[in-house]
A protein has these predicted regions:
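C-terminal catalytic "cap/lid" subdomain
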Residues: 2-75, 80-108, 112-380
Protein backbone atom coordinates (compact mmCIF):
# COMPACT_ATOMS: atom_id res chain seq x y z
CA UNK A 1 0.00 0.00 0.00
CA UNK A 2 2.84 2.39 0.88
CA UNK A 3 4.51 1.69 -2.46
CA UNK A 4 1.28 2.41 -4.33
CA UNK A 5 0.85 5.68 -2.47
CA UNK A 6 4.44 6.64 -3.29
CA UNK A 7 3.89 5.96 -6.99
CA UNK A 8 0.68 8.00 -7.03
CA UNK A 9 2.39 10.86 -5.23
CA UNK A 10 5.38 10.73 -7.53
CA UNK A 11 3.22 10.94 -10.66
CA UNK A 12 0.38 13.19 -9.55
CA UNK A 13 2.44 15.75 -7.64
CA UNK A 14 3.85 16.97 -10.98
CA UNK A 15 0.44 17.71 -12.47
CA UNK A 16 -0.38 21.29 -13.49
CA UNK A 17 -3.02 20.83 -16.19
CA UNK A 18 -5.96 18.46 -15.83
CA UNK A 19 -8.49 17.29 -18.40
CA UNK A 20 -11.67 15.92 -16.80
CA UNK A 21 -13.86 13.76 -19.05
CA UNK A 22 -17.38 13.33 -17.70
CA UNK A 23 -19.47 10.53 -19.17
CA UNK A 24 -23.15 10.63 -20.04
CA UNK A 25 -24.07 8.20 -17.26
CA UNK A 26 -22.49 10.52 -14.71
CA UNK A 27 -24.33 13.61 -15.94
CA UNK A 28 -27.89 12.52 -16.62
CA UNK A 29 -30.69 11.09 -14.53
CA UNK A 30 -32.36 7.77 -15.29
CA UNK A 31 -35.06 9.52 -17.31
CA UNK A 32 -32.46 11.28 -19.45
CA UNK A 33 -32.60 14.82 -18.11
CA UNK A 34 -29.50 16.74 -17.14
CA UNK A 35 -28.76 16.00 -13.49
CA UNK A 36 -28.24 19.59 -12.37
CA UNK A 37 -27.40 18.56 -8.84
CA UNK A 38 -24.63 16.29 -10.12
CA UNK A 39 -23.31 19.02 -12.42
CA UNK A 40 -23.36 21.40 -9.45
CA UNK A 41 -21.28 18.95 -7.40
CA UNK A 42 -18.78 18.35 -10.17
CA UNK A 43 -18.58 22.05 -11.02
CA UNK A 44 -17.74 22.76 -7.39
CA UNK A 45 -14.96 20.17 -7.52
CA UNK A 46 -13.57 21.65 -10.75
CA UNK A 47 -13.53 25.08 -9.12
CA UNK A 48 -11.68 23.59 -6.15
CA UNK A 49 -8.97 22.37 -8.52
CA UNK A 50 -8.79 25.83 -10.09
CA UNK A 51 -8.34 27.42 -6.67
CA UNK A 52 -5.61 24.87 -5.90
CA UNK A 53 -3.69 26.21 -8.90
CA UNK A 54 -4.60 23.70 -11.61
CA UNK A 55 -5.66 24.61 -15.13
CA UNK A 56 -8.75 22.49 -15.82
CA UNK A 57 -10.62 21.55 -18.99
CA UNK A 58 -13.92 19.68 -18.85
CA UNK A 59 -14.72 17.30 -21.72
CA UNK A 60 -18.41 16.69 -21.31
CA UNK A 61 -20.67 14.09 -22.84
CA UNK A 62 -24.40 14.34 -22.44
CA UNK A 63 -25.69 16.45 -25.34
CA UNK A 64 -27.70 13.65 -26.92
CA UNK A 65 -28.82 12.28 -23.55
CA UNK A 66 -29.82 15.77 -22.44
CA UNK A 67 -31.75 16.36 -25.64
CA UNK A 68 -33.58 13.05 -25.25
CA UNK A 69 -34.64 14.00 -21.76
CA UNK A 70 -35.70 17.48 -22.83
CA UNK A 71 -37.86 16.05 -25.62
CA UNK A 72 -39.19 13.19 -23.53
CA UNK A 73 -37.67 10.56 -25.83
CA UNK A 74 -37.12 7.19 -24.16
CA UNK A 75 -35.32 5.37 -26.98
CA UNK A 76 -32.10 6.70 -28.51
CA UNK A 77 -32.85 7.88 -32.10
CA UNK A 78 -31.46 5.64 -34.82
CA UNK A 79 -31.15 8.02 -37.78
CA UNK A 80 -28.34 10.54 -38.15
CA UNK A 81 -30.58 13.62 -38.67
CA UNK A 82 -32.55 12.75 -35.53
CA UNK A 83 -29.38 12.25 -33.48
CA UNK A 84 -27.95 15.55 -34.67
CA UNK A 85 -31.18 17.43 -34.01
CA UNK A 86 -31.48 15.97 -30.51
CA UNK A 87 -27.83 16.88 -29.85
CA UNK A 88 -28.47 20.49 -30.92
CA UNK A 89 -31.27 20.80 -28.38
CA UNK A 90 -29.38 19.00 -25.65
CA UNK A 91 -26.10 20.89 -26.03
CA UNK A 92 -27.68 24.25 -25.20
CA UNK A 93 -29.23 22.78 -22.05
CA UNK A 94 -25.94 21.15 -21.09
CA UNK A 95 -23.74 24.23 -21.42
CA UNK A 96 -26.42 26.30 -19.69
CA UNK A 97 -26.29 23.99 -16.70
CA UNK A 98 -22.49 24.25 -16.52
CA UNK A 99 -22.52 28.02 -16.86
CA UNK A 100 -25.13 28.40 -14.14
CA UNK A 101 -23.06 26.27 -11.75
CA UNK A 102 -19.69 27.86 -12.51
CA UNK A 103 -21.12 31.36 -12.07
CA UNK A 104 -21.99 30.50 -8.48
CA UNK A 105 -18.21 30.38 -7.90
CA UNK A 106 -17.28 33.38 -10.06
CA UNK A 107 -16.22 31.48 -13.19
CA UNK A 108 -17.55 31.35 -16.73
CA UNK A 109 -18.25 28.21 -18.75
CA UNK A 110 -16.61 28.53 -22.17
CA UNK A 111 -18.23 26.27 -24.76
CA UNK A 112 -15.72 24.67 -27.15
CA UNK A 113 -17.29 22.42 -29.81
CA UNK A 114 -14.79 20.47 -31.90
CA UNK A 115 -14.74 18.11 -34.87
CA UNK A 116 -12.08 15.72 -36.13
CA UNK A 117 -11.08 18.31 -38.74
CA UNK A 118 -10.11 20.75 -35.99
CA UNK A 119 -7.46 18.29 -34.87
CA UNK A 120 -6.27 17.12 -38.28
CA UNK A 121 -5.66 20.59 -39.73
CA UNK A 122 -2.40 21.73 -38.14
CA UNK A 123 -3.33 25.44 -38.09
CA UNK A 124 -6.75 24.81 -36.55
CA UNK A 125 -5.10 22.43 -34.09
CA UNK A 126 -2.70 25.15 -32.90
CA UNK A 127 -5.46 27.78 -32.86
CA UNK A 128 -7.58 25.55 -30.62
CA UNK A 129 -4.65 25.07 -28.27
CA UNK A 130 -4.01 28.83 -28.09
CA UNK A 131 -7.69 29.58 -27.50
CA UNK A 132 -7.97 27.18 -24.59
CA UNK A 133 -4.80 28.51 -22.98
CA UNK A 134 -6.19 32.04 -23.34
CA UNK A 135 -9.41 30.93 -21.63
CA UNK A 136 -7.32 29.77 -18.67
CA UNK A 137 -6.29 33.41 -18.21
CA UNK A 138 -9.85 34.75 -18.44
CA UNK A 139 -11.38 33.15 -15.37
CA UNK A 140 -13.14 30.73 -17.70
CA UNK A 141 -13.40 26.95 -17.62
CA UNK A 142 -13.43 25.39 -21.10
CA UNK A 143 -16.23 22.85 -21.55
CA UNK A 144 -15.37 20.78 -24.61
CA UNK A 145 -17.69 18.49 -26.53
CA UNK A 146 -17.71 16.88 -29.94
CA UNK A 147 -19.89 18.96 -32.25
CA UNK A 148 -22.57 16.28 -32.50
CA UNK A 149 -24.81 18.42 -34.71
CA UNK A 150 -22.38 18.35 -37.66
CA UNK A 151 -19.94 15.56 -36.79
CA UNK A 152 -20.95 12.31 -38.46
CA UNK A 153 -18.07 10.15 -37.23
CA UNK A 154 -18.54 10.89 -33.54
CA UNK A 155 -22.17 9.79 -33.45
CA UNK A 156 -21.67 6.76 -35.67
CA UNK A 157 -18.30 5.47 -34.54
CA UNK A 158 -16.73 7.26 -31.61
CA UNK A 159 -17.31 8.97 -28.29
CA UNK A 160 -15.78 11.51 -25.98
CA UNK A 161 -13.21 9.13 -24.49
CA UNK A 162 -11.21 9.52 -27.69
CA UNK A 163 -11.88 13.27 -27.72
CA UNK A 164 -10.60 13.64 -24.15
CA UNK A 165 -7.36 11.89 -25.12
CA UNK A 166 -6.90 14.23 -28.08
CA UNK A 167 -7.55 17.29 -25.90
CA UNK A 168 -5.06 16.01 -23.30
CA UNK A 169 -2.37 15.64 -25.96
CA UNK A 170 -3.32 18.96 -27.56
CA UNK A 171 -2.65 20.80 -24.29
CA UNK A 172 0.23 18.60 -23.07
CA UNK A 173 -1.85 18.15 -19.93
CA UNK A 174 -0.16 15.93 -17.37
CA UNK A 175 -3.37 14.19 -16.25
CA UNK A 176 -6.55 12.92 -17.85
CA UNK A 177 -9.32 11.97 -15.42
CA UNK A 178 -12.08 9.86 -16.97
CA UNK A 179 -15.17 9.93 -14.79
CA UNK A 180 -17.57 7.08 -15.43
CA UNK A 181 -20.24 5.01 -13.70
CA UNK A 182 -17.67 2.39 -12.62
CA UNK A 183 -15.04 2.65 -9.89
CA UNK A 184 -12.12 1.91 -12.21
CA UNK A 185 -10.70 -1.04 -14.14
CA UNK A 186 -11.77 -4.29 -12.48
CA UNK A 187 -9.64 -7.42 -12.28
CA UNK A 188 -12.58 -9.43 -13.64
CA UNK A 189 -16.10 -8.99 -14.92
CA UNK A 190 -18.21 -8.02 -11.88
CA UNK A 191 -21.26 -10.20 -11.32
CA UNK A 192 -23.57 -11.00 -8.43
CA UNK A 193 -21.67 -14.24 -7.81
CA UNK A 194 -18.15 -13.04 -8.53
CA UNK A 195 -16.78 -10.07 -6.63
CA UNK A 196 -14.49 -7.86 -8.69
CA UNK A 197 -11.69 -5.68 -7.33
CA UNK A 198 -10.51 -2.38 -8.78
CA UNK A 199 -6.92 -2.51 -10.02
CA UNK A 200 -5.26 0.49 -8.33
CA UNK A 201 -2.31 0.94 -10.71
CA UNK A 202 -1.65 -0.20 -14.27
CA UNK A 203 1.96 0.09 -15.40
CA UNK A 204 1.42 -1.00 -18.99
CA UNK A 205 -1.75 -1.41 -21.05
CA UNK A 206 -0.86 -4.89 -22.23
CA UNK A 207 -2.95 -7.39 -24.15
CA UNK A 208 -3.93 -8.97 -20.81
CA UNK A 209 -5.11 -5.61 -19.47
CA UNK A 210 -7.16 -4.99 -22.61
CA UNK A 211 -8.89 -8.34 -22.11
CA UNK A 212 -10.27 -7.03 -18.81
CA UNK A 213 -12.35 -4.46 -20.67
CA UNK A 214 -16.04 -5.20 -20.73
CA UNK A 215 -18.88 -3.44 -22.43
CA UNK A 216 -20.83 -1.28 -20.00
CA UNK A 217 -22.89 0.52 -22.64
CA UNK A 218 -26.13 2.13 -21.61
CA UNK A 219 -29.05 3.39 -23.64
CA UNK A 220 -27.58 6.88 -23.65
CA UNK A 221 -23.85 6.30 -23.38
CA UNK A 222 -21.68 5.05 -26.24
CA UNK A 223 -18.32 4.20 -24.74
CA UNK A 224 -17.53 1.23 -22.55
CA UNK A 225 -14.28 0.29 -20.82
CA UNK A 226 -12.67 -0.65 -24.13
CA UNK A 227 -12.78 2.92 -25.42
CA UNK A 228 -11.50 4.20 -22.09
CA UNK A 229 -8.49 1.89 -22.31
CA UNK A 230 -7.86 3.06 -25.86
CA UNK A 231 -7.91 6.67 -24.65
CA UNK A 232 -5.62 5.78 -21.74
CA UNK A 233 -3.21 4.11 -24.16
CA UNK A 234 -2.99 7.22 -26.34
CA UNK A 235 -2.32 9.49 -23.37
CA UNK A 236 0.14 7.26 -21.49
CA UNK A 237 2.10 6.59 -24.69
CA UNK A 238 2.52 10.36 -25.01
CA UNK A 239 3.98 10.46 -21.49
CA UNK A 240 1.00 11.59 -19.40
CA UNK A 241 -1.05 9.90 -16.66
CA UNK A 242 -4.67 8.75 -16.70
CA UNK A 243 -7.11 7.95 -13.89
CA UNK A 244 -10.43 6.17 -14.46
CA UNK A 245 -12.79 6.66 -11.51
CA UNK A 246 -16.44 6.83 -10.51
CA UNK A 247 -17.89 10.28 -11.16
CA UNK A 248 -20.40 9.90 -8.33
CA UNK A 249 -17.77 9.28 -5.66
CA UNK A 250 -17.92 12.19 -3.23
CA UNK A 251 -15.08 14.65 -3.80
CA UNK A 252 -13.53 12.38 -6.43
CA UNK A 253 -11.50 15.04 -8.26
CA UNK A 254 -9.85 16.45 -5.16
CA UNK A 255 -9.14 12.95 -3.87
CA UNK A 256 -7.38 12.06 -7.11
CA UNK A 257 -5.09 15.11 -7.25
CA UNK A 258 -4.33 14.67 -3.55
CA UNK A 259 -3.02 11.19 -4.40
CA UNK A 260 -5.70 9.21 -2.57
CA UNK A 261 -6.22 5.61 -3.67
CA UNK A 262 -9.23 6.31 -5.88
CA UNK A 263 -9.92 4.63 -9.20
CA UNK A 264 -7.28 3.13 -11.47
CA UNK A 265 -4.10 5.08 -12.21
CA UNK A 266 -2.44 4.34 -15.55
CA UNK A 267 1.23 5.22 -15.41
CA UNK A 268 2.77 7.33 -18.18
CA UNK A 269 5.65 6.20 -20.37
CA UNK A 270 8.96 7.70 -19.28
CA UNK A 271 9.53 9.65 -22.49
CA UNK A 272 7.20 12.59 -23.12
CA UNK A 273 6.41 13.08 -26.78
CA UNK A 274 6.70 16.55 -28.27
CA UNK A 275 3.51 18.31 -29.31
CA UNK A 276 4.31 17.66 -32.96
CA UNK A 277 4.90 13.95 -32.44
CA UNK A 278 1.61 13.68 -30.52
CA UNK A 279 -0.09 15.24 -33.52
CA UNK A 280 1.62 12.84 -35.95
CA UNK A 281 1.20 9.69 -33.88
CA UNK A 282 -2.20 9.99 -32.29
CA UNK A 283 -4.24 12.79 -33.85
CA UNK A 284 -4.37 12.44 -37.62
CA UNK A 285 -6.09 9.53 -39.33
CA UNK A 286 -3.49 7.77 -41.51
CA UNK A 287 -4.08 7.90 -45.27
CA UNK A 288 -2.45 4.55 -46.00
CA UNK A 289 -0.09 1.80 -44.85
CA UNK A 290 3.52 0.85 -45.50
CA UNK A 291 4.58 -2.74 -44.77
CA UNK A 292 8.19 -3.38 -43.79
CA UNK A 293 10.44 -6.40 -43.30
CA UNK A 294 11.80 -7.61 -39.96
CA UNK A 295 15.09 -5.78 -40.34
CA UNK A 296 13.40 -2.45 -40.94
CA UNK A 297 10.97 -3.00 -38.07
CA UNK A 298 13.86 -3.69 -35.71
CA UNK A 299 15.77 -0.63 -36.94
CA UNK A 300 12.73 1.62 -36.40
CA UNK A 301 11.32 0.23 -33.16
CA UNK A 302 14.53 -0.74 -31.35
CA UNK A 303 17.21 1.57 -32.74
CA UNK A 304 15.23 4.70 -33.55
CA UNK A 305 16.30 4.77 -37.19
CA UNK A 306 14.55 6.35 -40.18
CA UNK A 307 12.58 4.25 -42.66
CA UNK A 308 14.45 3.61 -45.90
CA UNK A 309 13.02 2.30 -49.15
CA UNK A 310 15.12 -0.86 -48.89
CA UNK A 311 13.07 -2.12 -45.92
CA UNK A 312 9.66 -1.64 -47.55
CA UNK A 313 7.87 -4.68 -48.96
CA UNK A 314 4.38 -3.37 -49.78
CA UNK A 315 2.14 -0.30 -49.87
CA UNK A 316 -1.60 -0.02 -49.20
CA UNK A 317 -3.86 2.90 -50.03
CA UNK A 318 -3.39 6.07 -52.07
CA UNK A 319 -1.54 8.90 -50.37
CA UNK A 320 0.60 11.91 -51.20
CA UNK A 321 3.90 13.27 -49.99
CA UNK A 322 3.38 14.85 -46.57
CA UNK A 323 0.51 12.58 -45.55
CA UNK A 324 0.49 10.58 -42.33
CA UNK A 325 0.76 6.82 -42.87
CA UNK A 326 0.85 3.73 -40.67
CA UNK A 327 3.92 1.49 -40.65
CA UNK A 328 3.08 -2.20 -40.28
CA UNK A 329 4.80 -5.52 -39.68
CA UNK A 330 4.84 -7.71 -42.76
CA UNK A 331 3.83 -10.96 -41.04
CA UNK A 332 0.77 -10.08 -38.97
CA UNK A 333 0.00 -6.64 -40.45
CA UNK A 334 0.17 -5.07 -36.98
CA UNK A 335 0.61 -1.30 -36.95
CA UNK A 336 3.64 -0.36 -34.85
CA UNK A 337 4.45 3.19 -36.00
CA UNK A 338 3.04 6.25 -37.73
CA UNK A 339 4.88 8.89 -39.64
CA UNK A 340 4.90 11.66 -42.20
CA UNK A 341 5.94 10.28 -45.57
CA UNK A 342 8.41 11.99 -47.91
CA UNK A 343 7.10 10.08 -50.93
CA UNK A 344 3.68 9.30 -52.39
CA UNK A 345 2.22 5.80 -52.53
CA UNK A 346 2.90 5.66 -56.28
CA UNK A 347 6.54 6.60 -55.75
CA UNK A 348 6.99 4.12 -52.90
CA UNK A 349 5.48 1.36 -55.04
CA UNK A 350 8.30 1.94 -57.51
CA UNK A 351 11.19 2.27 -55.03
CA UNK A 352 10.21 -0.33 -52.42
CA UNK A 353 13.13 -2.65 -51.75
CA UNK A 354 15.59 -0.31 -53.49
CA UNK A 355 18.74 0.98 -51.86
CA UNK A 356 18.84 4.73 -51.28
CA UNK A 357 21.45 5.17 -53.99
CA UNK A 358 19.08 3.70 -56.60
CA UNK A 359 16.08 5.94 -55.90
CA UNK A 360 17.15 8.59 -58.44
CA UNK A 361 17.67 5.92 -61.11
CA UNK A 362 14.18 4.50 -60.57
CA UNK A 363 12.24 7.76 -60.23
CA UNK A 364 14.49 10.08 -62.19
CA UNK A 365 14.91 12.19 -59.04
CA UNK A 366 15.48 11.77 -55.31
CA UNK A 367 13.57 13.98 -52.90
CA UNK A 368 14.98 12.49 -49.69
CA UNK A 369 17.17 9.63 -48.54
CA UNK A 370 14.45 8.52 -46.11
CA UNK A 371 10.87 7.56 -46.88
CA UNK A 372 10.00 8.59 -43.31
CA UNK A 373 12.55 10.47 -41.21
CA UNK A 374 12.81 9.41 -37.59
CA UNK A 375 11.99 12.97 -36.47
CA UNK A 376 8.64 12.61 -38.24
CA UNK A 377 7.82 9.16 -36.86
CA UNK A 378 6.23 7.86 -33.67
CA UNK A 379 6.57 4.28 -32.42
CA UNK A 380 3.19 3.25 -31.02
Amino acid sequence: MKLRDDIRSQILSKVKKVVVKIGTGVLTTDDGYVDREQIRRLAGQVVELKKMGYDVVVVSSGAIGSGMGELGIEKRPSTLPELQAVAAIGQSKLIGAYDECFKLHGYHAAQVLLTREDFEDRQRYLNTCNTIHTLFQMNAIPVVNENDTISVDEIKFGDNDALSALVTNLLNAELLIILSSVDGLYDRFPTAKSKATVIPIVENISHEIKQLAFDSKTARGVGGMQTKLEAASVVTNAGEAVVIANGRTEGVLKKIVQCENVGTLFLPKEEKLTSRKRWIGYTIKPKGKIYVDDGAMHALAEKGKSLLASGIVAVEGAFSKGDIVSVCKRENRTIFARGLTNYSSQEIEKIKGCSTSHIAKVLGYKLYDEVIHRDNMVIL
